């Protein structure tokens, strides 16, 4: 009897702890809706992670009839070569009330062009404007009056 109670308590604690487990970048990559990663369906993303975790360099077909591959994974970040000319990086960021998911997509034009979007952990809300301010020209230019004349 005591053994079954102890087993039930341990199972409950494990379940309780896993309910609050930290979201990983791999989980976010798999669970992202198609609106976030339109080139890859969920099964393709699962395959890509399996290939990467298995040490394979196998690429997966994407919706543009090209190929995509996971190139790096850590608990906090995942990097994906989406096409020959684009990448996607996802990072999970612990916050006070939720884990945020930052998605940075980059297109390799002559000067790489990136876009960052920050989502709630369930991807239900775009939180970019509340957690990130785009730099303005003034942020990049110094005040000329503070420079010494040469």
Residue ranges and their predicted role:
Residues 85, 96-103:
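Short linear interaction motifs
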Residues 90-96, 149-150:
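Structural signature of eukaryotic scaffold interfaces centered on beta-propeller domains
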